[in-house]
Amino acid sequence: MRLPEELLERARDIHSEAPSHRIKLDRVGSFGLKVPVEFKGFLLLAEADVWVSLPEGRRGVDLSRQVEAIYELSNPPKDPFSLCREAAISLLEKLNYADSSGVSIRFDAPLQDGESLKYYGVEISSIASDEIINKIRVEILGMTACPCTAELIRAYKSSEIAATHTQRSLGILEVSTKAEHPDPDKLASIIERAMSSPLRTYTKRPDEGGLVIRSLSNARLAEDVVREMIHLFLEEFGHLPEDTHILAAVRSMESVHMHDIYAERSFSLDEIRKEISSH
Protein backbone atom coordinates (compact mmCIF):
# COMPACT_ATOMS: atom_id res chain seq x y z
CA MET A 1 0.00 0.00 0.00
CA ARG A 2 1.33 3.43 -0.96
CA LEU A 3 0.08 6.49 0.92
CA PRO A 4 -1.47 9.31 -1.15
CA GLU A 5 0.86 12.21 -1.94
CA GLU A 6 -1.53 14.76 -0.37
CA LEU A 7 -1.34 12.89 2.94
CA LEU A 8 2.45 13.00 2.88
CA GLU A 9 2.35 16.72 2.17
CA ARG A 10 0.20 17.31 5.28
CA ALA A 11 2.47 15.25 7.55
CA ARG A 12 5.24 16.98 9.48
CA ASP A 13 8.83 16.40 8.38
CA ILE A 14 10.06 15.02 11.70
CA HIS A 15 13.68 14.76 10.59
CA SER A 16 14.00 18.47 9.79
CA GLU A 17 12.63 19.60 13.15
CA ALA A 18 14.87 20.96 15.90
CA PRO A 19 15.98 18.34 18.46
CA SER A 20 15.28 18.55 22.18
CA HIS A 21 19.01 18.84 22.83
CA ARG A 22 21.20 20.78 20.40
CA ILE A 23 24.09 18.33 20.17
CA LYS A 24 25.93 17.45 16.97
CA LEU A 25 26.26 13.75 16.08
CA ASP A 26 29.37 12.45 14.31
CA ARG A 27 27.76 9.59 12.38
CA VAL A 28 24.17 8.70 11.54
CA GLY A 29 23.43 6.25 8.78
CA SER A 30 22.37 2.91 7.38
CA PHE A 31 24.60 -0.07 8.18
CA GLY A 32 24.60 -3.56 6.66
CA LEU A 33 23.34 -2.70 3.15
CA LYS A 34 23.94 -5.36 0.48
CA VAL A 35 25.57 -4.10 -2.73
CA PRO A 36 27.20 -5.87 -5.71
CA VAL A 37 30.81 -4.97 -6.56
CA GLU A 38 33.26 -5.94 -9.30
CA PHE A 39 36.66 -6.96 -7.97
CA LYS A 40 39.49 -8.27 -10.16
CA GLY A 41 37.11 -9.97 -12.59
CA PHE A 42 34.76 -11.34 -9.93
CA LEU A 43 31.21 -10.16 -9.18
CA LEU A 44 30.85 -10.18 -5.38
CA LEU A 45 28.09 -9.39 -2.91
CA ALA A 46 29.43 -6.88 -0.41
CA GLU A 47 28.10 -5.28 2.77
CA ALA A 48 28.08 -1.49 2.97
CA ASP A 49 27.69 1.16 5.67
CA VAL A 50 26.79 4.75 4.75
CA TRP A 51 26.66 7.70 7.14
CA VAL A 52 26.73 11.48 7.45
CA SER A 53 27.30 13.89 10.31
CA LEU A 54 24.19 15.51 11.78
CA PRO A 55 24.23 19.19 12.80
CA GLU A 56 23.02 20.21 16.24
CA GLY A 57 19.96 22.00 14.82
CA ARG A 58 18.46 19.01 12.97
CA ARG A 59 16.62 16.11 14.58
CA GLY A 60 17.35 13.38 12.04
CA VAL A 61 18.84 12.46 8.67
CA ASP A 62 17.08 11.54 5.44
CA LEU A 63 17.82 7.82 5.48
CA SER A 64 16.23 7.11 2.09
CA ARG A 65 18.62 9.55 0.41
CA GLN A 66 21.56 7.79 2.04
CA VAL A 67 20.48 4.43 0.66
CA GLU A 68 19.74 6.02 -2.70
CA ALA A 69 23.28 7.46 -2.88
CA ILE A 70 24.96 4.05 -2.88
CA TYR A 71 22.29 2.03 -4.70
CA GLU A 72 22.25 4.44 -7.65
CA LEU A 73 26.01 4.11 -8.05
CA SER A 74 26.10 0.31 -7.67
CA ASN A 75 23.78 -0.32 -10.63
CA PRO A 76 25.51 -1.48 -12.73
CA PRO A 77 28.15 -2.86 -10.33
CA LYS A 78 31.53 -1.11 -10.20
CA ASP A 79 34.79 -1.58 -8.33
CA PRO A 80 34.54 -0.96 -4.56
CA PHE A 81 37.20 1.77 -4.55
CA SER A 82 35.27 3.99 -6.98
CA LEU A 83 31.97 3.14 -5.31
CA CYS A 84 33.25 4.28 -1.91
CA ARG A 85 34.66 7.57 -3.16
CA GLU A 86 31.74 8.47 -5.41
CA ALA A 87 29.09 7.51 -2.85
CA ALA A 88 30.79 9.56 -0.11
CA ILE A 89 30.74 12.62 -2.39
CA SER A 90 27.13 11.93 -3.42
CA LEU A 91 26.05 11.79 0.23
CA LEU A 92 27.31 15.33 0.83
CA GLU A 93 25.49 16.52 -2.28
CA LYS A 94 22.19 14.84 -1.37
CA LEU A 95 22.31 15.77 2.33
CA ASN A 96 23.81 19.25 2.16
CA TYR A 97 23.31 19.93 5.87
CA ALA A 98 26.08 17.42 6.67
CA ASP A 99 29.73 18.54 6.83
CA SER A 100 31.17 15.01 6.55
CA SER A 101 30.14 11.66 5.14
CA GLY A 102 31.53 8.17 4.89
CA VAL A 103 31.08 4.86 3.11
CA SER A 104 32.56 1.48 4.09
CA ILE A 105 32.35 -1.66 1.97
CA ARG A 106 33.26 -5.12 3.29
CA PHE A 107 33.71 -8.33 1.30
CA ASP A 108 35.76 -11.51 1.07
CA ALA A 109 38.31 -11.15 -1.73
CA PRO A 110 39.40 -14.21 -3.75
CA LEU A 111 43.11 -14.93 -4.00
CA GLN A 112 44.66 -17.58 -6.24
CA ASP A 113 46.10 -20.36 -4.09
CA GLY A 114 47.81 -22.91 -6.31
CA GLU A 115 45.05 -24.96 -7.93
CA SER A 116 42.29 -23.38 -5.86
CA LEU A 117 41.13 -20.07 -4.40
CA LYS A 118 41.32 -18.80 -0.86
CA TYR A 119 39.66 -15.70 0.54
CA TYR A 120 40.72 -12.84 2.76
CA GLY A 121 38.71 -10.08 4.39
CA VAL A 122 38.74 -6.56 2.93
CA GLU A 123 37.13 -3.37 4.22
CA ILE A 124 37.38 -0.29 2.00
CA SER A 125 36.27 3.15 3.23
CA SER A 126 36.18 6.74 2.04
CA ILE A 127 35.47 9.71 4.31
CA ALA A 128 34.56 13.02 2.66
CA SER A 129 34.63 16.51 4.17
CA ASP A 130 36.95 19.28 2.95
CA GLU A 131 39.08 16.46 1.52
CA ILE A 132 38.71 12.74 0.95
CA ILE A 133 40.53 10.20 3.12
CA ASN A 134 40.70 6.66 1.73
CA LYS A 135 41.08 3.74 4.09
CA ILE A 136 41.59 0.01 3.55
CA ARG A 137 41.78 -2.88 6.01
CA VAL A 138 42.95 -6.37 5.03
CA GLU A 139 42.82 -9.48 7.23
CA ILE A 140 44.30 -12.86 6.27
CA LEU A 141 45.25 -15.98 8.20
CA GLY A 142 48.76 -17.38 8.26
CA MET A 143 50.77 -19.87 10.32
CA THR A 144 53.26 -19.00 13.04
CA ALA A 145 55.66 -21.29 14.87
CA CYS A 146 56.90 -20.44 18.36
CA PRO A 147 60.70 -19.84 18.46
CA CYS A 148 60.83 -20.08 22.27
CA THR A 149 59.57 -23.66 22.41
CA ALA A 150 61.66 -24.53 19.35
CA GLU A 151 64.79 -23.43 21.22
CA LEU A 152 63.88 -25.56 24.23
CA ILE A 153 63.35 -28.64 22.03
CA ARG A 154 66.55 -27.92 20.10
CA ALA A 155 68.53 -27.71 23.33
CA TYR A 156 67.01 -31.01 24.45
CA LYS A 157 67.38 -32.93 21.18
CA SER A 158 70.32 -31.03 19.58
CA SER A 159 68.57 -31.20 16.21
CA GLU A 160 68.85 -28.76 13.32
CA ILE A 161 65.08 -28.32 12.96
CA ALA A 162 63.28 -28.46 16.30
CA ALA A 163 59.63 -29.25 16.82
CA THR A 164 57.46 -26.52 18.32
CA HIS A 165 53.81 -25.57 18.58
CA THR A 166 52.22 -23.84 15.62
CA GLN A 167 49.00 -21.87 15.37
CA ARG A 168 46.83 -19.95 12.97
CA SER A 169 47.45 -16.23 13.26
CA LEU A 170 45.28 -13.42 11.93
CA GLY A 171 47.32 -10.62 10.38
CA ILE A 172 45.78 -7.17 9.94
CA LEU A 173 46.94 -4.19 7.89
CA GLU A 174 44.86 -0.99 7.90
CA VAL A 175 45.88 2.05 5.83
CA SER A 176 44.35 5.56 5.86
CA THR A 177 45.65 7.87 3.15
CA LYS A 178 44.83 10.89 1.00
CA ALA A 179 46.16 8.90 -1.97
CA GLU A 180 44.30 6.15 -3.83
CA HIS A 181 43.41 2.96 -1.95
CA PRO A 182 46.41 0.58 -1.88
CA ASP A 183 45.99 -2.74 -3.72
CA PRO A 184 44.49 -5.22 -1.20
CA ASP A 185 46.25 -8.19 -2.83
CA LYS A 186 49.61 -6.53 -2.12
CA LEU A 187 48.61 -5.92 1.50
CA ALA A 188 47.54 -9.57 1.83
CA SER A 189 50.90 -10.65 0.36
CA ILE A 190 52.77 -8.52 2.92
CA ILE A 191 50.90 -10.20 5.77
CA GLU A 192 51.53 -13.70 4.42
CA ARG A 193 55.24 -13.06 3.85
CA ALA A 194 55.58 -11.78 7.41
CA MET A 195 54.25 -15.04 8.87
CA SER A 196 56.24 -18.20 9.51
CA SER A 197 54.30 -19.68 6.59
CA PRO A 198 51.15 -18.92 4.59
CA LEU A 199 48.09 -21.16 4.84
CA ARG A 200 46.71 -23.15 1.92
CA THR A 201 43.14 -24.09 1.01
CA TYR A 202 44.00 -27.23 -0.97
CA THR A 203 47.02 -29.37 -0.09
CA LYS A 204 48.26 -32.91 -0.54
CA ARG A 205 50.59 -34.70 1.87
CA PRO A 206 53.89 -33.41 0.37
CA ASP A 207 52.50 -29.86 0.41
CA GLU A 208 51.48 -30.16 4.06
CA GLY A 209 54.92 -31.44 5.00
CA GLY A 210 56.56 -28.56 3.15
CA LEU A 211 54.38 -25.99 4.91
CA VAL A 212 55.22 -27.40 8.33
CA ILE A 213 58.96 -27.52 7.61
CA ARG A 214 58.85 -23.97 6.27
CA SER A 215 57.04 -22.82 9.40
CA LEU A 216 59.44 -24.60 11.77
CA SER A 217 62.45 -23.20 9.88
CA ASN A 218 61.02 -19.68 10.15
CA ALA A 219 59.69 -19.58 13.72
CA ARG A 220 58.37 -16.14 14.66
CA LEU A 221 56.74 -14.46 17.62
CA ALA A 222 53.64 -12.34 17.07
CA GLU A 223 55.93 -9.38 17.78
CA ASP A 224 58.29 -10.54 15.00
CA VAL A 225 55.41 -10.74 12.54
CA VAL A 226 54.22 -7.19 13.26
CA ARG A 227 57.73 -5.78 12.82
CA GLU A 228 58.21 -7.73 9.57
CA MET A 229 54.86 -6.47 8.26
CA ILE A 230 55.97 -2.89 8.91
CA HIS A 231 59.33 -3.50 7.19
CA LEU A 232 57.67 -5.03 4.11
CA PHE A 233 55.03 -2.29 4.00
CA LEU A 234 57.72 0.40 3.89
CA GLU A 235 59.43 -1.41 1.01
CA GLU A 236 56.19 -1.70 -0.98
CA PHE A 237 54.31 1.48 -0.08
CA GLY A 238 57.00 3.93 1.01
CA HIS A 239 55.86 6.30 -1.75
CA LEU A 240 52.57 7.11 0.02
CA PRO A 241 52.12 10.57 1.63
CA GLU A 242 54.00 11.14 4.88
CA ASP A 243 50.76 11.58 6.86
CA THR A 244 49.46 8.17 5.76
CA HIS A 245 48.43 6.26 8.88
CA ILE A 246 48.93 2.50 9.25
CA LEU A 247 47.84 -0.14 11.75
CA ALA A 248 49.77 -3.42 11.71
CA ALA A 249 48.47 -6.13 14.04
CA VAL A 250 48.50 -9.88 14.69
CA ARG A 251 46.16 -12.04 16.77
CA SER A 252 47.69 -15.45 17.39
CA MET A 253 45.16 -18.20 18.24
CA GLU A 254 47.46 -20.15 20.53
CA SER A 255 47.55 -23.95 20.48
CA VAL A 256 49.12 -24.45 23.94
CA HIS A 257 47.44 -21.60 25.82
CA MET A 258 43.82 -20.98 26.81
CA HIS A 259 44.04 -17.46 25.40
CA ASP A 260 45.18 -15.58 22.30
CA ILE A 261 48.30 -13.43 21.89
CA TYR A 262 47.92 -9.96 20.35
CA ALA A 263 50.48 -7.42 19.12
CA GLU A 264 50.02 -4.18 17.19
CA ARG A 265 51.69 -0.95 16.10
CA SER A 266 49.89 2.16 14.90
CA PHE A 267 51.98 4.80 13.12
CA SER A 268 52.28 7.40 10.37
CA LEU A 269 54.91 6.99 7.66
CA ASP A 270 56.68 10.13 8.84
CA GLU A 271 56.75 8.87 12.43
CA ILE A 272 58.10 5.40 11.65
CA ARG A 273 60.80 6.73 9.32
CA LYS A 274 62.09 9.10 12.00
CA GLU A 275 62.06 6.30 14.56
CA ILE A 276 63.99 3.89 12.34
CA SER A 277 66.56 6.51 11.28
CA SER A 278 67.27 7.40 14.92
CA HIS A 279 68.59 3.90 15.69
Swiss-Prot record:
Q: How is the cofactor bound?
A: Binds 1 Fe(2+) ion per subunit.
Q: Pathway of this protein?
A: Cofactor biosynthesis; 5,6,7,8-tetrahydromethanopterin biosynthesis
| BP GO annotations | tetrahydromethanopterin biosynthetic process
What superkingdom heads the lineage? Archaea
Annotated GO molecular function terms are: GTP cyclohydrolase activity; GTP cyclohydrolase I activity; GTP cyclohydrolase IV activity; iron ion binding
Q: What Enzyme Commission number does this protein have? A: 3.5.4.39
Tell me its cofactors: Fe(2+)
Q: Where is this site: May be catalytically important?
A: C146
Function, please? Answer: Converts GTP to 7,8-dihydro-D-neopterin 2',3'-cyclic phosphate, the first intermediate in the biosynthesis of coenzyme methanopterin.
Query: Subunit notes for this chain?
Result: Homodimer.
Annotated family: Belongs to the GTP cyclohydrolase IV family.
Its name, as the record gives it, is GTP cyclohydrolase MptA
Q: Print the organism lineage.
A: Archaea, Thermoproteota, Candidatus Korarchaeia, Candidatus Korarchaeales, Candidatus Korarchaeaceae
